[in-house]
């Protein structure tokens, strides 16, 4: 008689930045994000008998084959050297998430059992990323699935914190806003923690104590959706790298300059005003703040020359403005997606905007806010 195989499945939604990009990477600066109804799914099961010497087997619908890993000094090492560098690069966020959950288990006197993990993504199409936060979503889903598989009962905040630690180990410059949107779902106001502080704390006192400690700068709260506005999303077909754009900005002398200070102050005021508009149901003020956010990103682009606004993103914004809406790049810009807020009752205007987008080479994405996170 054989026992049934244990299987845990977790789904994490993608995200879009509504306002606060670039400024949010500094701890305590606010941003608004919304989770969207395309998900990444992570399935964790007991290891098959034929996995051989592998402790963990990871497969993804974005990768060519399953890759076996084994534990060595708390880290996962590729079993087959031929898979090495490519596998670690392609699966970096999944691996870091498993390792971070493993650290927590180790501190509690447990270990990660042998398992197989598979990733299925609707944040891509034909291998192309839409820019909906796939790295964040897969990290959040992996943390949740592996933790549940190992019997860890974690609060929503603890799942976010584990995902933040896993992500910061790979790149401490990322704000974690994508992780928060995937974790809580809906519309959120977000402030990033000091990643250098929390990484150092985890190395000094361990993951378990770090989960319970105060995190300077960090805040998340749910927001109501706009009352009479619909969120429209357009994809430029031009993939952008948030990490490289943010890194480029970090390398420039702009950081710490008077221009940088003005950008952060104006963006912070804009985001706080937009939060107030959402909480009071003031759609007119919200549209005004989205326009301000676009203008501030345009000023940053003019001063620093990052390439935030591509011709397609500019056309996307102009089409929405022409019917009285408000639009801007979502996230780091340079490609990927733009968002527009339009009168939800003006169906002809919405159709007109979508048609203008298509003429400009922008693909309207059939997305709606995901009300629940993972």
Curated annotation (Swiss-Prot):
Pathway linked to the protein: Isoprenoid biosynthesis; isopentenyl diphosphate biosynthesis via mevalonate pathway; isopentenyl diphosphate from (R)-mevalonate: step 2/3
GO BP of this protein: isopentenyl diphosphate biosynthetic process, mevalonate pathway
Enzyme class: transferase
Species whose genome carries this gene: Streptomyces sp. (strain CL190)
Descriptive protein name: Phosphomevalonate kinase
Physiological role: Catalyzes the phosphorylation of (R)-mevalonate 5-phosphate (MVAP) to (R)-mevalonate 5-diphosphate (MVAPP). Functions in the mevalonate (MVA) pathway leading to isopentenyl diphosphate (IPP), a key precursor for the biosynthesis of isoprenoid compounds.
Assembly notes: Homodimer.
Keyword Kinase: yes
């Amino acid at each position: 008689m054989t026992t049934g195989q244990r299987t845990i499945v977790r789904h994490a939604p993608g995200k879009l930045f509504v306002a606060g990009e670039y400024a949010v990477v500094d701890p305590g600066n606010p941003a608004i994000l919304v989770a969207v109804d395309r998900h990444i799914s992570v399935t964790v099961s007991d290891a098959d008998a034929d996995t051989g010497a592998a402790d963990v087997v990871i497969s993804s619908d974005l990768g060519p084959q399953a890759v076996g890993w084994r534990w060595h000094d708390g880290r996962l090492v590729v079993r087959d050297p031929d898979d090495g560098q490519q596998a670690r690069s392609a699966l970096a966020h999944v691996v870091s998430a498993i390792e971070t959950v493993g650290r927590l288990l180790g501190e509690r006197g447990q270990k990660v059992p042998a398992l197989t993990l598979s990733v299925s993504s609707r944040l891509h199409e034909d291998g192309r990323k839409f820019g909906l936060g796939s790295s964040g979503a897969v990290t959040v889903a992996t943390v949740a699935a592996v933790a549940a598989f190992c019997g860890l009962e974690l609060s929503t905040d603890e799942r976010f914190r584990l995902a933040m630690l896993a992500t910061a180990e790979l790149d401490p410059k990322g704000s974690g806003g994508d992780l928060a949107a995937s974790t809580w779902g809906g519309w959120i106001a977000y402030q990033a923690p000091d990643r250098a502080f929390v990484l150092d704390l985890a190395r000094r006192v361990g993951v378990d104590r770090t989960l319970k400690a105060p995190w300077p700068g960090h805040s998340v709260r749910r927001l109501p959706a706009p009352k009479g506005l619909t969120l429209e999303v357009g994809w430029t077909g031009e993939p952008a790298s948030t990490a490289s754009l943010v890194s480029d900005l970090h390398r420039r002398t702009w950081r710490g300059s008077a221009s940088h200070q003005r950008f952060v102050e104006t963006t912070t005021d804009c985001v706080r005003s937009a939060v107030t508009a959402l909480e009071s149901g003031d759609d007119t003020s919200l549209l005004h703040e989205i326009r301000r956010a676009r203008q501030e990103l345009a000023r940053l682009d003019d001063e620093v020359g990052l390439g935030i606004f591509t011709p397609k993103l500019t056309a996307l914004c102009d089409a929405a403005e022409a019917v009285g809406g408000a639009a801007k790049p979502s996230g780091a810009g340079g490609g990927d997606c733009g968002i527009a807020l339009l009168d939800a009752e003006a169906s002809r205007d919405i159709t007109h905007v979508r048609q203008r987008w298509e003429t400009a080479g922008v693909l309207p994405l059939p997305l709606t806010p995901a009300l629940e996170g993972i």
